[in-house]
């Protein structure tokens, strides 16, 4: 004890009056891992919040790095089609956009005459494109399915030119991002009108042949994997089958129960076959005998119309141009 006091006295009074140096604690190894876990948890919370309450969609033109003129030019190159730039820009302008922009100008105090925009909407191009698409699709379907009646052809054309199919194609071709509309997301009728206006612009720019190939490549392909009666609603398939057989001088079909399983259970299954002149022409399943009979009639109609599941695939190779066909198409357009 005395020796320790002696050493302190030797170091001088400064050592005695010096403040004590705090001892640093060793670093805790789990601090960084805790920060990482908290950061991951915060990111997961943010992801779930976006999934439950997604932000409203924003126009592409409201985001950075957007050049409308360059995007319109790139649209034709992306589809490998030649468009007149003025016609293509007109195809993307809808009347609702012009009205909304004029209303915004008037709300800012601009006079009505000065607020008018020197723009032309796509109504004329839409009518041309829709009319040409109807004629072209009808011709394609009549050539591919010659036994299909006119009612069936019209139903298929209506399906291919309906809002669901056309808007699906238009969105995948980025037509929605270039469409000038008062609302966003673009309403389905406006998007459908814009797509057919683009076809009308292509018809005037490159001619009927390129427009027909465009329709074949982007609308006819939507029939892939579709069953005939998904696109054509037939209320009474048995009555239609009787009419078709009568046109072909074939006797009326007779239905016979060919197989059944689980008739006393909750999930029964029946197979009904249709016979003409003692020959089985079709067979269909169903949970009741009536449903199975209707399905057998649909199977027979598919065979008559050449719309079976094992039919020859659609030929998408470049068609050989027929002078007579080309002349008819050009005259029709």
UniProtKB/Swiss-Prot annotation:
Residues 236-306 form the DRBM domain. It is found in: Mitochondrion. One of its GO terms (molecular function) is ribonuclease III activity. It holds the Pfam family DSRM_MRPL44. Residues 311-333 are annotated as: Disordered. One of its GO terms (biological process) is mitochondrial translation. InterPro entries: dsRBD_dom, Ribosomal_mL44_DSRM_metazoa, RM44_endonuclase, RNase_III_sf. Residues 86-228 form the RNase III domain. GO terms for cellular component: mitochondrial inner membrane; mitochondrial large ribosomal subunit; nuclear body; plasma membrane. CDD domains: DSRM_MRPL44. Keywords: Endonuclease, Hydrolase, Mitochondrion, Nuclease, Ribonucleoprotein, Ribosomal protein, RNA-binding, Transit peptide. Residues 311-327 have a biased composition (Basic and acidic residues). Its EC number is 3.1.26.-. Residues 1-30 form a transit peptide. Component of the mitochondrial ribosome large subunit (39S) which comprises a 16S rRNA and about 50 distinct proteins. Component of the 39S subunit of mitochondrial ribosome. May have a function in the assembly/stability of nascent mitochondrial polypeptides exiting the ribosome. Belongs to the ribonuclease III family. Mitochondrion-specific ribosomal protein mL44 subfamily. This is Large ribosomal subunit protein mL44. The gene is Mrpl44.
């Amino acid at each position: 004890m005395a020796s320790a006091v002696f050493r302190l006295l030797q170091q001088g009074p400064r050592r005695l009056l010096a403040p004590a140096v705090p001892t640093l604690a060793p670093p805790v190894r789990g601090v960084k891992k805790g920060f990482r876990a908290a950061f991951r948890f915060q990111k997961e919370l943010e992801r779930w919040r976006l999934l439950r309450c997604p932000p409203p969609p924003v126009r592409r033109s409201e985001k950075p790095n957007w050049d409308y003129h360059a995007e319109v030019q790139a649209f034709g190159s992306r589809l490998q089609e030649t468009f007149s730039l003025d016609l293509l820009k007109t195809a993307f302008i809808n009347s609702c956009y012009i009205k909304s922009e004029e209303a915004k100008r008037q709300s800012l105090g601009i006079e009505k005459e000065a607020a008018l925009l020197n723009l032309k909407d796509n109504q004329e191009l839409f009518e041309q494109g829709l009319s040409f698409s109807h004629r072209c699709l009808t011709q394609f379907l009549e050539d591919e399915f010659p036994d299909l009646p006119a009612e069936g052809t019209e139903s298929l054309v209506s399906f291919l030119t309906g809002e669901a199919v056309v808007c699906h194609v238009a969105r995948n071709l980025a037509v929605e991002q270039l469409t000038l509309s008062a609302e966003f997301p673009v309403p389905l009728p406006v998007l459908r009108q814009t797509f057919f206006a683009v076809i009308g612009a292509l018809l005037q720019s490159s001619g009927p042949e390129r427009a027909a190939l465009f329709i074949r490549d982007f609308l006819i392909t939507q029939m892939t994997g579709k069953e005939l009666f998904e696109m054509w609603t037939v209320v009474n398939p048995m009555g239609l089958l009787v009419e078709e057989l009568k046109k072909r001088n074939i006797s009326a079909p007779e239905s016979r129960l060919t197989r059944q399983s689980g008739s006393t259970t909750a999930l029964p299954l029946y197979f009904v076959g249709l016979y003409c002149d003692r020959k089985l022409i079709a067979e269909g399943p169903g949970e009741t005998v009536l449903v199975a009979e209707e399905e057998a009639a649909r199977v027979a109609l598919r065979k008559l119309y050449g719309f079976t599941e094992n039919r020859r695939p659609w030929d998408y190779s470049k068609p050989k141009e027929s002078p007579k066909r080309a002349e008819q198409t050009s005259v029709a357009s």
